[in-house]
Structure formats: C-alpha cells, structure tokens
From Swiss-Prot:
Annotated organism of origin: Rhodopseudomonas palustris (strain TIE-1)
Keywords carried by this UniProt record: Dioxygenase, Iron, Metal-binding, Oxidoreductase, Vitamin C
HAMAP family cross-referenced by the UniProt entry: Hydroxyl_YbiX
Name of the molecule in the record: PKHD-type hydroxylase Rpal_3968
Residues reported in the UniProt entry to bind Fe cation: 98, 100, 161
GO molecular function terms noted in the UniProt entry: 2-oxoglutarate-dependent dioxygenase activity; iron ion binding; L-ascorbic acid binding
Binding residues annotated for 2-oxoglutarate, in chain numbering: 171
Pfam families linked to this entry: 2OG-FeII_Oxy_3, PKHD_C
Keyword Transit peptide: no
A GO biological process held by the record: DNA damage response
Amino acid sequence: MLVCIPEVLPKSEVAEFRRLMDAADWEDGRSTAGAQSAMVKRNEQLPPDSDLARTLGRRIVSALTGNPKFVSAAVPLQIFPPLFNRYAASGGHHFGIHVDNAVRGDHLTGLRIRTDLSVTLFLAEPDEYDGGELVIEDTYGSHEVKLAAGDAVLYPSTSLHMVTPVTRGARVASFFWLQSMIRDAQARSMIYDLDNAIQALVERLGRDDPETVKLTGIYHNLIRYWAEV
C-alpha cells in the first residue's frame, strides 16, 4: 500500500526548514546506511545527532501524528527520529535499488523499531530539480513519486526502491521509518480501507447512524484483534 499525504507541512514551515538546513553542515549519507545500501548510496545528510536534525524531526513527527490520513494508514506505534538528506546534481547523487534494514536503532534514545513502513517527506518543489524520483517497486510494478514540498509518501519498508540521479538542482527531503501497531501489511491495508469507508458514511449519513456506529465498532474490534502494543 502506497499512500500520498498532502500538506503535512505548510509552505511557510518548509521555507523555514530550508533556511535552517541551507546554513547547516552536511555529511556523507553513507554514514547511516547498512552494508548493502552503502554500496549504492550517494547523497548528503544532516548529522543525525545534530540539534537541528532532532529539532526539525520532532516538528515533523508532531505534524504527522496530528494528521488523520497518516494515523489511519500507518496506525503508528513507534516513529524513528526523522533524518534529512540532499541529492545534488553537482555531486552526481543518487541511491540505487535497495531495501531498508528490517530493524533500526537510535543510540541517543535507545529506541529500536521493526521497520514496517517508510516515509519520505519532500522539502523541495518538483521544479527545483530534475531527476530525483523515488521509484518504489511492488507486485503491481514500479511507481515514480515526486511530490510537492510539504507532501509525504508512506510505503512498505519491504519494498525495493531507489532515488534516480539528480541532473539539475537539489532534491531535499526527510526520511524515516515507523513500527505499526498492526504488523501484517494486508491487515493494515484493510483497516485503512475500512476507515475510509466509515468516514465516507459519516459524511453522508451522520456519525449517529446505526450502521455507521456498527461499522465503527467492527473497526475498533479489528484493531483490538490485530494490534501489538
């Protein structure tokens, strides 16, 4: 399940992020990659332990956990502290095909998560750079994603994916992972579809409609059945 989430951050906040990030020191992105990923990764990152990365990351997590579409699709249990990367044409930056590590640990907080879902939050407008598409492969083929600044995409961490070479400008983004309360991807997808159907019925029939109430009960009971907390 691939879900695009518009306007996670407003344009004004994206501009503030970019101003702070443009003034920061960046490091080789391979410092946070696993052995296989490091062989195909060419980009820059904000130092993950820097005050700036941690501060901006907390703001992203706060925005996402208040976003109903994100909560519905992810059913998040733990969110890894967001990281920040930059792909510049001047550096020939790209990230070859790879799959994310199954478990991520943060040595500052001691947090360890199973990576169920990956998130990319775009911080550069599509017309600021050429190339840099996020290409995600699943059973239905390849999907190219290049969203407006402030928008995010959520996709299974089990997916093979890549970032195509940037040939003009710079692609700036935040990326991170989360552990869902619902481990099984198919169950999580059904929960998301059910929630969307319930919200559509609420709009049409009202929250007090007996069938809407019944379906809402089924939704919560399915989460109760599947959730790991």
